[in-house]
A protein has these predicted regions:
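Extended polysaccharide-engagement surfaces of secreted carbohydrate-active enzymes
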Residues: 1-189
Length: 189
């Protein structure tokens, strides 16, 4: 990954249990971008991407491509929300470090379903911490690329966060190797 004084970019390439994916995360002062592409699976089980799981707190508002809960907005296509009481045991969660301590809580979960054996599935989600429902609805993300070669977004200040999975070019910037970059008008991080 890479970082400047107010933005960060991280990348994760998954190859686990028959599921492969390229995932990139872009952080700035207003939003967190989650991009996933090249999602493939040979597993007989359904594949999903979890965006957030937390205790439910109050109302949930939804639109065609947005969800808002507890001061956090989510923008993206095919977002799936589930709520309900879940039961667990902190003793199991901690790996046996603590004594058994059963608990129940109403949870809010949001994610994307990719189905069984997806081929080249992808997703684009933006998380908006501190946003109102109206701000969430009206937010216009600037996602430049989300493909096997490059994942890139334009941040609110005009800087560009980019993950190159291969050599490539973005505007006047060119890299001969895979890399993670933040591009501004006068600096490269």
């Amino acid at each position: 990954g890479t970082v400047n004084s107010h933005q960060a970019v991280a990348v994760y390439t998954q190859k686990l249990d028959g599921v492969s994916a390229k995932k990139a995360y872009f952080f700035d002062e207003k939003a967190v971008y989650l991009l996933g592409c090249s999602i493939n699976s040979t597993s007989p089980y359904s594949v999903a991407t979890t965006v957030n799981v937390c205790r439910r707190n109050g109302l949930i508002e939804k639109g065609d491509s947005w969800v808002w809960h507890d001061g956090i907005g989510y923008k993206g296509e095919s977002l799936r929300v589930s709520t309900g009481i879940r039961t667990g045991d902190w003793g199991v969660v901690s790996g046996g470090i603590t004594s058994p301590a059963p608990f129940s809580a109403e949870l809010f979960a949001i994610g994307i379903e990719h189905g069984i054996r997806p081929e080249n599935a992808s997703y684009k989600v933006v998380i908006l911490p501190g946003a109102t429902p109206e701000q969430t609805k009206n937010f216009q993300p600037k996602i430049l690329f989300n493909n096997n070669d490059i994942q890139a977004v334009k941040f609110s200040d005009g800087n560009i966060g980019a993950v190159f999975h291969t050599s490539g070019r973005l505007g006047n910037f060119e890299t001969k190797k895979p890399g993670v970059f933040i591009l501004s008008s006068d600096e490269i991080f």
